[in-house]
Design a protein with these regions (language model features):
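Residues that form generic nucleotide/phosphate-binding pockets
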Residues: 16, 27, 47, 164, ...
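Metal-dependent nuclease catalytic cores that hydrolyze phosphodiester bonds in DNA/RNA
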Residues: 1-106, 222, 228-230
Length: 230
């Protein structure tokens, strides 16, 4: 069991399972580079959270947006895009917003399409485990909504996925404690990463190291600040 100060972002699990180096660059070194794909993903999350009410009742479904999450067992905290509460005859929990019994059903919004790597499923399963710990009820299913297909992909939180999620959470804490960024390894999935140029810059006439790339990036940012002050 972890303490409050030891909790790490639930969203970091997706990065960790996709690539430990990407996770370390973001959460250890504080490096982030937007590209059209990440910007599209941010817009999708904003639409999921919406500007309307945080919760609304649609028939036998109560929709809650931007829901706070926490698990001391996994050592994670964060927010869920959407948690649907489905009305059930038995085995659910009571909510202040509506009468009856309800079961939580987390929904995470992602740009693109379903991936071969189960990084999105692990993140969603971690959200389910957080909800179980917070609400004291089993969460057996959820869904991933992909912007490219405009469809949901159902996810069952079976023993295998739960074990993968617990291992990923443990590894995330180990990685943060080690304070060491893993070495770069070129893989086909690197082309999908917004940090590709930071992680493994394309060699220029004199060769471009990560250090040189970051130095140039800082100089551009400082130049932008100077122009704003003028």
């Amino acid at each position: 069991v972890y303490a409050e100060d030891d909790l790490l972002p639930v969203s970091a699990l997706q990065h960790l399972v996709f690539c430990e180096r990407q996770c370390a660059l973001i959460y250890l070194e504080g490096i982030w580079e937007d590209n059209p794909l990440t910007i599209e993903g941010s817009h999708l999350h904003e639409r999921a959270h919406g500007s309307g009410p945080r919760s609304e009742l649609r028939g036998d479904t109560l929709i809650a947006r931007d829901v706070a999450l926490r698990s001391f067992r996994l050592g994670l905290s964060g927010r869920a895009d959407v948690v649907e509460f489905h009305r059930v005859a038995e085995g659910g929990i009571r909510l202040a917003e509506a009468d009856g019994l309800w079961l939580p059903f987390p929904v995470e919004y992602k740009r693109g399409r379903p991936k071969k790597i189960r990084c999105d499923e692990v993140q969603l399963c971690a959200q389910a485990i957080c909800l179980e710990e917070m609400l004291g009820v089993g969460v057996m299913r959820g869904a991933l909504f992909y912007g490219a297909t405009k469809k949901r992909t159902g996810v069952v939180f079976d023993e295998g996925l739960r074990a993968d999620t617990e291992r990923a959470a443990k590894r995330l804490h180990e990685l943060m404690a080690e304070q060491r960024t893993p070495a770069a390894v070129r893989e086909p999935k690197c082309r999908q990463c917004s940090l590709e140029e930071v992680c493994m810059p394309a060699p220029g006439p004199r060769g471009r190291s990560v250090r040189r790339y970051l130095h140039a990036s800082m100089e551009r940012n400082l130049a932008g600040l100077d122009s704003e002050e003028e």
